[in-house]
């Protein structure tokens, strides 16, 4: 039988039951707040149930799609840090280094023990690993904060960013689309050999960080659907 995991959170509740909060993450009426506009914070929120993302017996990998709306709001609209991610990590995942590491990684060198894939929405230029053009960007990260693929992105401060992320298990392509209400859009895709990177069972979630500069990072809604094909007996 196929394993299907599906959930939809059209808006968050103060006592949201199916989330695990880490660092500064919490829910209020209708939204998930990862960071407030204060310096040097890390906030994360995970879906409470582990997800079976691949199966060692069959070798099968799940197809999945997740959609969410997030808002980054910096008080002055200009000095913004550090960014927001959707990530896939081991079931026992804990907050990692803050600041430019976005709460999901601890270094810029490839670390296979991290077993983490993230899609980052990076608002602050870290010269040691970010694209040399110095621009804000969307990135796909595999076991390191240094993205394997990036797309420059103009943050619309305080606006709702509508995101869809999907993984095609046949092609191993991870695709990201971001759309603002004024129809400015961005797309990015890259091959990610998921079963060579993450454990069979994972947690999924969001993280956000601030540093010397800051912003509020909020999620307004979240859906997820994965399908892992069972043995073909």
Swiss-Prot record:
Glycosylation sites noted in the Swiss-Prot or TrEMBL record: 168
Annotated S-S bridges: none
Keyword Glycoprotein: yes
Pfam entry (one): Lectin_legB
Keywords: Calcium, Glycoprotein, Lectin, Manganese, Metal-binding
Positions bound to Mn(2+): 120, 122, 130, 137
This protein's record includes keyword Calcium: yes
Superkingdom of origin: Eukaryota
Note: Binds one manganese (or another transition metal) ion and one calcium ion. The metal ions are essential for the saccharide-binding and cell-agglutinating activities.
Family of this protein: Belongs to the leguminous lectin family.
PANTHER family reported in the protein's UniProt record: CONCANAVALIN A-LIKE LECTIN FAMILY PROTEIN, LECTIN
Protein name in the entry: Favin
